[in-house]
Design a protein with these regions (language model features):
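Conserved micro-motifs of the catalytic ATP-binding
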Residues: 49-54, 88, 92-95
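A conserved beta-strand-to-alpha-helix junction within the catalytic ATP-binding
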Residues: 55-70, 83
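Short helix-loop "hinge" at the ATP-lid/N-box region of the Bergerat-fold HATPase_c
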Residues: 111-112
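Short conserved segment of the HATPase_c
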Residues: 143-155
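Short alpha-helical segment of the dimerization/phosphotransfer core of two-component systems
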Residues: 29-34
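Short conserved segments within the C-terminal catalytic ATPase subdomain
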Residues: 75-84
Length: 208
């Protein structure tokens, strides 16, 4: 939405029809994602278990990943670099594109939030007949062994953070797990303190 506000304040940008169309599409993409995310968080806070409503459709995963990366908000004081890798001729994925985008946004946001000033984020997509594998790796603070299972629990926040003022309520990874499992997929985590974190999501091609 910051892109849209900047656009409204820039007269020259508003005169460019192609730019206008792109900014409007990006803004609608972000609004749809925000609406779905807030709705899911409300469900998670208000109920212990509630069925996740998915609206699956076929979409280009590479295009979605690249859009999420492009629209990522980089906080002041952070220098963030991305690298991405995709298989050639990857078929469309049938899943809920809004929730998948939010899952990826959560992982990227965590990678930025729980890292130092210079952040390196690697996003790798693999594809086979069983499904798609999406991995997000970073060079952040890492997670202590005794906390690796707990980080997917609702409202859990690490006690090993070097900066106790990092904002958050502990719902991001809980949301990630719930959405992935609603797609009949799985999520796994590998991490070492001081060496970063790698989170891998597997979604079956025949899940929906």
């Amino acid at each position: 939405m910051k892109v849209f506000v900047s656009f409204l304040n820039d007269r020259e940008m508003r005169m460019d029809e192609a730019t206008t169309e792109r900014v409007l599409q990006d803004s609608m993409f972000e609004l749809d994602n925000l609406s779905a995310y807030l709705g899911k968080l409300k469900d998670m806070v208000c109920a212990d278990e509630r069925e996740t409503l998915l609206r699956p459709s076929a979409f280009n995963l590479r295009e979605l990943v690249e859009k999420v990366v492009r629209l990522t908000n980089i906080p002041a004081g952070k220098k963030v670099s991305f690298s991405t890798a995709f298989p050639p001729d990857m078929p469309d994925l049938t899943a809920d594109p809004v929730h998948v985008a939010n899952v990826l946004s959560n992982l990227i946001e965590n990678a930025i939030k729980y890292s130092g000033e210079e952040v390196n984020i690697d996003i790798v997509v693999l594809w086979n007949q069983q499904g798609v594998e999406l991995t997000v790796s970073d060079n952040g603070f890492g997670i202590a062994p005794d906390e690796r299972r707990k980080v997917f629990e609702k409202f859990y926040r690490s006690s090993h953070l070097p900066d106790k003022q990092i904002p958050g309520i502990g719902l991001g990874l809980s949301y990630v797990r719930q959405i992935v499992e609603a797609h009949h997929g799985s999520v796994s985590l590998r991490s070492e303190l001081g060496e970063g974190t790698r989170i891998t999501i597997n979604l079956p091609t025949t899940a929906l």
